[in-house]
Amino acid sequence: MEDYDIPSPAPQIISLTPSAPRGMPPAIIEQASGSSRYTSVGSMGSSSSAEHFPLLHAYNSSASSQARIRTGTTPEPGSVAGASWPASCEAPSASNPPKQHVWLIFGATGTIGRHICRAALERGDVVMACSRNIKTTVAVPQEWSDRLLTSSCDVRSRQMVKECVDRTVQRWNRIDVVLNCVAIGVIAPCEEQEEHDVRAQFETNVMGLFHIVQTTLPYLRLRNRGRYIVFSSIAGILGIPGLGPFSGTKWATEGFVESLAYEIEEFGGKATLIYPGTIKQDETQDKISPPWRHFLIKPLSNEYRDTPAEHARRMILWLGAHRTTSVEKIGEIIWELAHSNNPPLRLLLGSEAVETMREKLRQTIEEVEDWKFLFTGDADDG
């Protein structure tokens, strides 16, 4: 294995009890203090700076709007809160009741992963929850105990991934939904990223997904159905200075999953990329973990101070006070997505993700139009 030192995390206590009533703080999971050098979690999106990515203006311009969004009194722009799924999606409904699904979730102890686990269990599905070094005490209602398995899994190891897949099939004879929200990132300018850190990010974020797909796809293909739900990031929409290799892994994920979606459509398979905005963390976690715990922050050299390369570091610190996307709502949406007959290839959750994608597409179209006349023919005019 590469030089990728990951001290064992402190034991976690995972509570998958049903959701608290609306308006009450969700009592979901309490994680003991102590952190790894890297944490396998659902990757966070990062919005843009005023100089390089105009999206930040929208959030700094109206403190009152932010307050309404954070308190839930106003549906978040761009989210599906208060809106129905498009009819073409054929989401679960009274006329299209959901069938029980078997979930295989990688990154199940991250903020996003465990909320999805809970959403699936609350609605009658069964879950194999996998995470690296998952030394946990799982507290679940008695009626859920026969619908939840847990397993330690480092996605860089193809063998460990295969063992999780085999256990799932042995227990429930099938896999309906494969979900991956494992990702690591290192914050530093491209020039100053260590080779072993870059390799670690690609081994986890790209090769880990490759292992997951290759070991699960035969079972999905055999049944002519199934779906992949893969968490991307705003860093998969645009390159973020200070997160070059991490953005690279997310762009690789983009191409891989989109290609996969075309390949598996022939036998009824579906694949969806998820782009979350800045995720609200668990209330208990906020008290014991820094908002940047998702990334390893490297010291910045004098050469890169006060340059765009410092953007990612500033944004991670900024996120601590500007998280607007409800992770509980994400769990509910992902469950509905998994039970929809015609899911989209891309699903953006939160106004930051939506506006960042719009801005990226706008800039790309403008650039194409500005430069398209430079070369207009396919043959050499001599």
Where are these regions (language model features)?
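Substrate-binding pocket helix/loop in short-chain dehydrogenase/reductase
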Residues: 189-190, 194-199
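Rossmann-fold cofactor-recognition segment
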Residues: 144-159
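Conserved glycine-rich cofactor-binding loop
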Residues: 109-110
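SDR active-site lid
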Residues: 266-343
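Active-site helix of classical SDR
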Residues: 213, 249
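Conserved glycine-rich Rossmann-like NAD(P)H-binding loop of the short-chain dehydrogenase/reductase
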Residues: 123-138
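Residue(s) in the substrate-gating loop at a strand-loop-helix junction
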Residues: 233
